[in-house]
């Protein structure tokens, strides 16, 4: 059975849209890669966040990134927020034992 990688994405603006499309395409381009589960998308505005969740195919949404990072069912945290927030989120995710992808 193929391994599953459960992804959380923090941020859903322009780069969040781009990364969402990339996550959906990974297994198409790399069929031998682990299965990608787009588990949770996180942002501040509940309404816009729910729209992004439905539009891009994420299973769940959450407004508190700290809750997302604390979850046991997340393997990768994809940080797509504004640049001045990257450090705090990325370091917290690494300390929680997550793999981190951080948009520059």
Language model features: what each stretch is:
Residues 1-56:
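N-terminal Rossmann-like dinucleotide-binding module
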Residues 47, 56-103:
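Beta-loop-alpha module in the N-terminal Rossmann-like domain of NAD(P)-dependent dehydrogenases
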């Amino acid at each position: 059975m193929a391994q599953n990688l459960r992804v959380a994405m923090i941020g859903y603006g322009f780069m969040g849209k781009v990364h969402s499309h990339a996550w959906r395409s990974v297994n198409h381009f790399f069929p031998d890669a682990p299965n990608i589960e787009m588990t949770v998308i996180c942002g501040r505005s509940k309404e816009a966040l729910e729209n992004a969740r439905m539009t891009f195919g994420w299973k769940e949404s959450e407004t508190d990134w700290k809750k997302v990072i604390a979850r046991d069912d997340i393997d990768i945290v994809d940080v797509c927020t504004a640049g001045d927030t990257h450090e705090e989120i990325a370091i917290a995710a690494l300390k929680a034992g997550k793999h981190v992808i951080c948009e520059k």
